[in-house]
Amino acid sequence: MFRLPKKVIDDIQKYDEKLKQFLSGKINSTFFRGVRVPWGFYSQRGGKLLMSRLRIPAGILTPSQLKAIGIAAKNFADGKLHITTRQDIQIHNVPFENSIKIIDYLKDFNISPRGGGGNTVRNITCCYLSGICSKEKTEVYKMVWGLTEYLLSLEESLNLPRKFKIAFSGCEKDCAFTGVNDVGVIALDDGKFKVLCGGGMGAKSAVGKVLCENIDQDEVYYVIKSVFNVYNKYGDRKNRHHNRLRFLIEDIGWEKFYDLYKKELDNIRGNEYIPIRYENDVNVLPELPDAGLIGCSEDETYNLFIKHNTAKQKQKGYYYAEIRIPVGEISSEELLKLCEIEGFVPTLIFRTTQRQNIVLTNIPYDKMFYVYEKIKSIFSDFLYPETVLDIVSCKAATTCNLGICNAIDLAKNIIEELNSKLDTTVIEKLKDVKININGCPNACGQHPIGTISFSGLARRVYNRSVPFYKIYLGGKIDGENTKLAQEKGILPARVIPKFISELVLTLQGSLNIEYLTFNIEQLIKKYSYVPSYEEDKNYYIDFGKTEEFSFAGLSQGECGAGVIDMIEADLESAKQSLIKSKEKNLEITDIKDALIYSARALLVVKGVDPKSEEETIFGFIDKFINTGICNPEFKNLNEIYQNIVSNKITKEQAYEYTQKFYQEVKKIYSLMDSNFNFVARFKEIISTEDKRQKHPKTLTYDLRGTPCPINYVKIKLKLEELNIGDVLEVYLDDGEPIKNVPKSLINDGQEILKIEQVKNFFKVLIKRKV
């Protein structure tokens, strides 16, 4: 099974420290957002509670893990959960102070929200039947687990230009939607693989191109790391609306991108080793005496369940059962009851799907009726997964800050409408019709790949706001040949259920897109009328609401939260402190705060996390003044700070200096490039007693006993003290230090001259190149 890397466990203490600082008022909410979002904690609508997105690599969970998630949701929140389109599970309505409790409790079950949000490598998905499907060429879930363990061990995986999504499909049927991921891997015959690159959904959705094919399994990891490195080096970190991998490829062109990728691949092959753990299988199933068949019953619902929810596994005598979880909404109570099935089916393993369902696997044929009875006692609406009734929806306006419309309740109303109009025969004919809904233009509900799909927006009608949806048609998954759904028009939200019902009834099992296009265009015209408020006020009220539709609750999205947020939070705090000081007759405490906020703002880019005001001041002097990035007129920064603290400077002088310093820091920030590099506009300041040697030198630095990533940060700081061409000899421990630190330094552009093992530690020779 998947193992949570030690780095993730070690980093929990850092999160705990920042949480305590936030709760005690030592850091503000914007700064803390840059900390919590990469830990998978998003602010919900209203800002008072959090959502915790737990990453579930490959979507596979043991009963004990699923039970732990249910317990965490019950004990640390209000028991409401949501299954996502990337096979994650979200715990909703989490008080801020309970976020650390979720992290700490679930780590013992190898579950974590780490990397569930922000500019990180997101949950790596794969076919939800990987390992039990008779059609798969390779059991790709094992690759997902190994790659996830590796990437979560890398510091750079948590500070990318933007989110980075990876998917694995076990065959060319492409159940994992590889074509709409940043990197998609498809298993071919004879243990070979094809890798796609540059796909994605959301703003300017795109289908990935073939980067390479017919490569071996071991090569896949090097290819992915090469793409990862290119994106990390050249992706635009400052423009939040244009910083996905597909935009980098668009800006520089495929040929230039491919050249960068090939150079990076050659560099990694020659200098790195990617350690992937292969001993990560799901437990081997005991052999059954015979294959066995599941019999029929007088219970008609059971017969429908067998027909539509179950199928054989490739393992003799075993079956799986997929439970349709309407719009992915489930409670902790339901999860915990579901886990009780393990008592009768000890081989049970759970899986989450891209259509927000739960699959029970490894069920012996003679125990299926018991499983059905248990499922029936828990859920009231569980038949027909992967059909027209299996509607995908994001959380939308129920909890999401960006949600315009209430997609969740629209989906529930569509399901209710279809259930009242469709019989079993029609549902069977429409099994390939996929309906996807988003509450806003973003693609959390994956509307670009739906057969029929919707994204929320608003329009003014008779001077009132009305919830509307864009309508899309024709999405189809097929690797690099994936077709994205095309926009066909807009309709008011209130008519969508009847519109869908009439549309699917005209299909009669035909998915001819030309025929469907004609019908959809005619129906859009039919349903496009919006009556006045006096005539029918329901048009002006969203599904699931009683009040009139409005934009109340909308706020800034947090998906890209990270370094930029932390910088801008400190700059804004500095600005507000200066304003407060002026309002209070130049209050000296506010002036001092503005000075500290200004000095701290950019230190995060240099990997400095000061624990005191003094460390902040000296950190800025060392990283920005002495290096020529900041105007040397501020070389007396520490002297001014000390004078402010000891009241040896007038309020007017302190305010004027701090105001100028704040403006200088803002200017430095404005000149920072998209890769967080700064322009050295002035000469370096070198003290007489600390002059650097003009000829190359070699220093020794013993970091034995220093854990990751502290050892890496210390080496970076030490290298900055050296001239270009100088050599640093470092002593590193075996294990994580020797595995991770050299690779990180190579990614920084440094040169590793030699790695030599000496008894139980390693000597590493590093040449400063940049």
Model-identified regions with their sequence ranges:
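Peripheral terminal and linker regions in Fe-S/redox and tRNA-modifying enzymes
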Residues: 1-580
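A glycine-rich helix N-cap at a beta->alpha junction
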Residues: 108, 748-756
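Long, charged low-complexity segments
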Residues: 562-579, 599-687
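Short, hydrophobic, well-ordered secondary-structure elements
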Residues: 585-604
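An N-terminal amphipathic alpha-helical segment
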Residues: 689-722
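Amphipathic alpha-helical interaction surfaces in cytosolic regulatory modules
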Residues: 710-717, 734-750
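Core SAM-dependent methyltransferase catalytic element
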Residues: 763-770
